[in-house]
Curated annotation (Swiss-Prot):
This is 4-hydroxy-2-oxovalerate aldolase 3. The record marks R21 as: Transition state stabilizer. GO terms for molecular function: 2-isopropylmalate synthase activity; 4-hydroxy-2-oxovalerate aldolase activity; manganese ion binding. InterPro entries: 2-IPM_HCS-like, 4OH_2_O-val_aldolase, Aldolase_TIM, DmpG_comm, DRE_TIM_HOA, PYR_CT. It comes from Azotobacter vinelandii (strain DJ / ATCC BAA-1303). The keyword NADP does not apply. It catalyses: (S)-4-hydroxy-2-oxopentanoate = acetaldehyde + pyruvate. The gene is lapG. It comes from the Bacteria. It holds the Pfam family HMGL-like.
Length: 350
């Protein structure tokens, strides 16, 4: 009988590193240009073909709601792109937050790939942005966030819409780190059934239930050819799929990634870990994100709300999960924490 590793032997997978975009969340958006260059050039030398570089919330992300980075997206992108020898710089664009004008600026600064991201039921907000990215000649992916909140048939319909707008790759995005391998397989498989053979499928995982690697392998089994991850797992919540660990698993299974495993390990240990303000791991609160199906970016916001209102962050996160709050509703974290504090007699009503 053919084993799992035998069935994937020789399969080619493209890595896309997120530590300079998703990792901004874990660093409270405080990564400097020189740090960006150091990380990106090391990833480039390790053979990583795509490196995402923006504010954590993507183009247009600098704001009161999402936090302010020390530099503009244009400064980050331009500085990194100028140093790349083989890797392409990518960006995140959420329609309604980022604009086509900002995408043009990112392209002018050297970005050549984009994740156009919508909630998993709102692909119809992305046609203009996807079409514009294709017009610029960018490698263009549709990115269905919080994919656990739509069933496989729904994900297939949304992915088909993104493909019709011009997306060359469609992502199943486990923003909450909630999914298990069978959930990933069902959604990726549903996409593979309806998308054209030439349209790629990607998977973006978070490690909140410790399933980032298993889910990424499940995605490949079901037909995905692009996998997002982050060296040392630097990302929101318990981090993204740790790329160097995933690379080692792929090598064991005979999956062709094209990256230098030992160099990736060195980037993680020598550059990323010393940058961390806190160890990005599965802790009480990040585990709650995965358990309750909450957007991973809410982690630090909820911890700050807990300090302010005296309600445990875990309780806040469970309530946000019950309400099915999604990315972009960060303002509701404070509102929820305040309401819970009032209900518990911790805060006097005005």
């Amino acid at each position: 009988m053919m084993s799992q590793s035998d069935s994937l032997k020789g399969r080619k997978v493209v890595f896309h590193d997120m530590c300079l975009r998703d990792g901004m969340h874990a660093k409270r958006e405080q990564i400097g240009v020189e740090q960006m260059i150091a990380v990106a050039t090391a990833l480039d030398a390790a053979g990583v073909p795509y490196i995402q570089v923006t504010h954590g919330a993507g183009l247009g992300g600098n704001s009161l709601q999402h936090g302010f980075a020390p530099h503009s997206n244009e400064e980050y992108i331009g500085a990194v792109a100028a140093k790349m020898k083989q890797a392409k710089v990518s960006v995140l664009l959420i329609p309604g937050l980022g604009t086509m004008k900002e995408l043009q600026s990112a392209f002018d600064c050297g970005a050549r790939s984009v994740h156009v991201a919508t909630h998993c039921t709102e692909a119809d907000t992305s046609p203009q942005h996807i079409a514009f990215a294709r017009k610029l000649g960018m490698d263009t992916s549709g990115f269905l966030m919080m994919s656990h909140l739509n069933d496989p048939a729904g994900i297939a319909r949304q992915g088909k819409l993104m493909e019709s707008y011009g997306a060359q790759t469609v992502y199943v995005t486990d923003s909450a780190g909630y999914m298990l391998p069978e959930d990933v397989k069902a959604r990726v498989g549903a996409l593979r059934e309806v998308l054209a053979p030439e349209t790629g499928i990607g998977f973006h995982g978070h490690h909140n239930l410790g399933m980032g690697i298993a889910n990424s392998i499940a995605a490949i089994e079901a037909g995905a050819s692009r996998i997002d991850g982050s060296v040392a797992g630097l990302g929101a919540g318990a981090g993204n799929t740790p790329l160097e660990v995933f690379a080692a698993v792929c090598e064991r299974m005979g999956i062709d990634t094209g990256v230098d495993l030992f160099r990736l390990m060195d980037v993680a240990e020598d550059i990323i870990v010393p940058m961390m303000e806190h160890v990005v791991r599965v802790d009480r609160e990040s585990l709650t994100l995965g358990y309750a199906g909450v957007y991973s970016t809410f982690l630090l916001h909820s911890k700050r709300a807990a300090e302010r209102f005296g309600v445990p962050a875990r309780d806040i996160l469970v309530e946000l999960g019950r309400k099915k709050m999604i990315g972009g509703q960060e303002d509701m974290i404070l509102d929820t924490a305040m309401s819970m504090a009032k209900a518990r007699g911790l805060l006097k009503s005005a």
